[in-house]
Amino acid sequence: PRARVELSVKPSEAVSSTIFGGIVGGFLLGIPFLNLLLVWGVLGGFLTVHLLKMRVDKFGNGYIKNSDALLFGGLSGVVSAFIATLFNVVYAVLLKDWFVQAGEFLVSSGMDSALADVTIKLCVTDLSLSLPFILLKLIAMIILFAVLGAVGGALSSEFSKR
């Protein structure tokens, strides 16, 4: 087995990988109802660090050091939060009637109306497009998705050490 080498990454080398991983994670986290599977945020961070490793590892025996993996995975999560928020607002505008019907279906299936309302707000956003709610959700998503992306980045780094 070849010895593994810790790779150092310059921020300028990580921009495209971080943005691409964030776009993939944000797209998947922006799909209503599928976004409740938060694993997509981990996948975005994992993809970011994997692409970064492919870019800077000239000899195929390196791994991204943990601090860089956490940083760039987390940054991809921040990008994901903005993209997912954009998708949520677009879906709320274009598919409002469908989401109202989905909420009514949940209530008719026996779900409490307050819980159905929260479910729709988590899956998309407040259908009345309340700016304070959208901003609060964006802040929460930035924090959550940054953590998920950092976890994905750390996992990618650990897998590449093997």
What are these regions (language model features)?
Residues 1-162:
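Juxtamembrane/disordered regions of integral membrane proteins
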